[in-house]
Amino acid sequence: MARAKFERNKPHLNIGTIGHVDHGKTTLTAAITMTLAALGQATAKGYDQIDNAPEEKARGITINTAHVEYETENRHYAHVDCPGHADYVKNMITGAAQMDGGILVVAATDGPMPQTREHILLAKQVGVPSLVVFLNKEDLMDDPELLELVELELRELLSSYDFPGDDIPIIKGSGLQALEAMTKNPKTKKGENPWVDKIYELMDAVDSFIPTPERDVDKPFLMAVEDVFTITGRGTVATGRIERGKVKVGDTVELIGLKDTRTTAVTGIEMFKKSLEEGLAGDNAGVLLRGLKKEDIERGMVIAKPGSITPHTQFEGEVYVLTEKEGGRKTPFFAGYRPQFYVRTTDVTGTIKAYTSDEGKEVEMVMPGDRIKMTVELINAIAIEQGMRFAIREGGRTIGAGVVSKIIK
C-alpha cells in the first residue's frame, strides 16, 4: 500500500551519494532505506529499484536519477543516487537535484580514485556545503593500518579542495554486508548486527554534521521578472516566480540588470487576480512598482531586497557541454565563441574568453561531452551570484549547462 505523504514536522534536507564508479553508492543507498524501513521511517528499496533510475529532463538535458526518501529521528531526507558518472556531472551542474550535503562513498580497497576527486571538486564548485564520508568494503580489508592510511589520504584530499578534512566524519563499514543482513531479517534493529549499526552510525553523522539549510523564505527577497504590463490607473506590474524570501506592500526594492539599478517601492502584490499583503518564496505573483513605466522594466531583470545581489558582466563557470546525441553541437568550439547565456528568465549574449582544465591549465578546444571551466564576459550586466545555474544556448537550443563558480567583475 502506498504510504501517506510524509508529515513535514521535521527539517527537510536534500542529500545524495557521490563517489567513484563501483565503490558502492547504490548498494549503500539501498542499505540505508532498508535499515530505516525497520523503524517504519522509509520504504525499503532494493538495489535494482534504485539502479534502474528513470530519465528526467533538467534544463533540456536528460539525466538518470534515482530518488528515495527516508527519515531519521531528527530529519526528513530526499536522497539522490545516479547510475552513471556522466549523470552525476550533469546532475550537480544543472542543480536538477540540489544537494544540501553529500555522502562521499569510497571503497577502502581502492582508496580515492579519479572520480572521487572529480566529485569532490564538483561538490566544491557547485556549492554543496557539507560532506560526510562512508569508507565502504571494510569487510574486504584485513590490514587496519592500510585502512588508516586510506582515511588519512582522504582527509588530505578533502582539505586540498577546501573541505574541513580534519573534522569530516569518516564512517567505516560495508553497504553490502548491511544490505544482506537486512534482506535476511528486515526487522533487524540497532544493536543486533555490527554492519547494520554502521549504517545507523553513518545516519547519526549525517544528522549531526550536515547543517540544516536556511529555508528559501528566510533568505533575502528575489524575483526574476518574466513579464511586464500596465494596469490603467494603478501603474506597472512585473510578474514572475518569487525565487526566495518574502515581499510586503510598502517594501523598498531594487530593480537590477540590463539597465542601471533603480530603487522603487512595492505598492501592491497580486496572485490569481487577488490582492495580497505578502508574497512568499515559490509564489507566482504580480508586483506593482511605484513610479515606473512599462518600458523601465524588462524580462531578465530581477526585483530584490536592496543590496542583496549586484549586476555583473564577468564570471567563471563550471560547464557541462552536451553531446550531439543529447541535442548539443556536433563540432567543437574555441575561445572567442559567442553563444547566449540563459540566466533565470532571459538569454544574454556573452563571449567565452578562456577555458581551464581541472588542473588549472588553459585548454584550446572544447568538445561536445566535455566538462570544463570557462571565463565568460556578457554584453549586458545582469544579477549574478555564485552558485547560480545557467544554460548555454545557440539559436534557441541548449548546448551546455553551467553553474557560476566565481564572480570576476
From Swiss-Prot:
GO terms for cellular component: cytosol. Its EC number is 3.6.5.3. One of its GO terms (molecular function) is GTPase activity. InterPro entries: EF-Tu_GTP-bd, EF-Tu_GTPase, EFTu-like_2, EFTU_2, G_TR_CS, P-loop_NTPase, Small_GTP-bd, T_Tr_GTP-bd_dom. It is found in: Cytoplasm. GTP binds at residues 19-26, 81-85, 136-139. Residues 136-139 are annotated as: G4. It is an enzyme of class 3 (hydrolase). Residues 174-176 are annotated as: G5. Residues 60-64 are annotated as: G2. Its main location: cytoplasm. It comes from the Bacteria. NCBIfam families: EF-Tu, PRK00049.1, PRK12735.1, PRK12736.1, small_GTP. PANTHER family: ELONGATION FACTOR TU, MITOCHONDRIAL, ELONGATION FACTOR TU-RELATED. Monomer. Belongs to the TRAFAC class translation factor GTPase superfamily. Classic translation factor GTPase family. EF-Tu/EF-1A subfamily. This is Elongation factor Tu. It comes from Nostoc punctiforme (strain ATCC 29133 / PCC 73102).
